[in-house]
């Protein structure tokens, strides 16, 4: 209402017990469910908690869709399916804490640590590139002034001076095979030693305005989308097989700038959670467990600064794409249930969505740091609220 100030409300999430390292390898029984994990900077611990809890409950999905940083944790999950493996979502997160933010949740100390140890960070600040990038932008402004001084704006050019590149990936510097290893494991889904789980993730071509959804063989079979084909109802979506280059592109952040070849970026910027490909009549999936890296509404104080406003804009953008995906599934459920306003499509199938959403407000500055409390919360809520609702197939 006009004249009424937006309320300020601060939700304090409950504290959860710290999760301990794996001590057992419970038998994994594949259920009639898929998992959709959304990646978002410092909130990746949330999805890691969801998938780790499912493992410790012995619930194995038929299909995993993942975006951005959740690609790494899906890789860790698949590695962790091998009994005795030292790589799993829990251990990957702990290694991140030890190497990139050893001072727990102390923001300033951890950020200073990242700056001082940037040569050794997997994703580092663009410290050595900063001067050259600034000079490049200054040169661009000077050329525009000389070419058209009448339309030149000092204010506009001041805002354009800060470089787009603020981070640099050093993935292949520390592990030259990191992207090929991820692709190889994702594609190791069939055969007697295969993990048997469909995997798909996405990337976005910002020049063509197209989304690429990369799938392994099991995912292609479950969804009915063959690699090389396009979407019949959404012509901007193309389906491709998983390759090393696909993994590299799907992990390419805005903040890396645009100095590298290619036009594909992290697909989470376009579609943070991949849901609509999962329902397909006859594939045996009737439930999707969704690891939402954001809450469904604003939980913190109303924004009063520009940086807080940028956080709200980011959250609304990510929520919008997810609600579109979820709404499509709920519409099909309604058509199947009522037959109105039209009959459902021939391949329609009912889907139950079980959400594990973020239970706390994490702002712009928290996006550069993971939080163990986020992992603990997602883990315990998945174990107590989601796992009991996942029916396991009856024994033959």
Each predicted region: which residue ranges?
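Catalytic nucleophile serine of serine hydrolases
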Residues: 68
């Amino acid at each position: 209402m006009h004249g009424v100030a937006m309320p300020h409300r601060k939700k304090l999430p409950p504290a959860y017990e710290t999760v301990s390292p794996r001590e057992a390898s419970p038998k994994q029984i594949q259920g009639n469910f898929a998992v959709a994990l959304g990646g978002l900077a410092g909130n990746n611990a949330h999805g890691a908690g969801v998938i780790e809890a499912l493992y410790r409950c012995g619930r194995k999905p038929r299909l995993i869709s993942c975006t951005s940083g959740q690609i790494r944790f899906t890789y860790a999950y698949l590695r962790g399916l091998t009994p005795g493996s030292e790589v799993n979502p829990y251990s990957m997160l702990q290694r991140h804490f030890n190497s990139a933010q050893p001072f727990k949740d102390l923001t300033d100390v951890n950020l200073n640590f990242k700056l001082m140890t940037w040569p050794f960070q997997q994703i580092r600040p663009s410290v050595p590139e900063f001067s050259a990038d600034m000079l490049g932008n200054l040169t661009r402004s000077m050329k525009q002034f000389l070419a058209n001084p009448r339309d030149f704006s000092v204010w506009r050019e001041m805002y354009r001076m800060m470089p787009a590149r603020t981070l640099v990936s050093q993935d292949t510097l520390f592990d030259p095979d990191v992207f090929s290893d991820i692709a190889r494991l994702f594609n190791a889904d069939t055969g007697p030693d295969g993990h048997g789980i469909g995997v798909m993730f996405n990337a976005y071509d910002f020049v063509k305005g197209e989304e690429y959804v990369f799938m392994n063989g099991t995912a292609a079979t479950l969804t009915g989308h063959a690699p090389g084909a396009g979407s019949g109802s959404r012509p901007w979506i193309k389906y491709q097989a998983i390759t090393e280059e696909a993994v590299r592109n799907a992990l390419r952040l805005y903040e890396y700038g645009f100095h590298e070849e290619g036009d594909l970026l992290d697909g989470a910027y376009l579609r943070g959670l991949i849901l609509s490909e999962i329902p397909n009549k006859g594939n045996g999936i009737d439930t999707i467990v969704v690891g939402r890296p954001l809450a469904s509404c604003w939980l913190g104080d109303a924004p009063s600064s520009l940086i807080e406003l940028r956080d709200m804009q980011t959250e609304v953008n990510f929520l919008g794409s997810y609600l579109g995906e979820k709404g499509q599934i709920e519409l099909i459920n309604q058509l199947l249930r009522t037959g109105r306003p039209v009959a459902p499509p021939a391949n329609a199938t009912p889907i139950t969505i079980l959400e594990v959403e973020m239970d706390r407000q994490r702002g712009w500055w928290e996006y550069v740091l993971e939080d163990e409390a986020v992992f603990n919360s997602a883990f315990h809520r998945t174990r107590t609220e989601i796992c009991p609702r996942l029916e396991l197939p009856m024994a033959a």
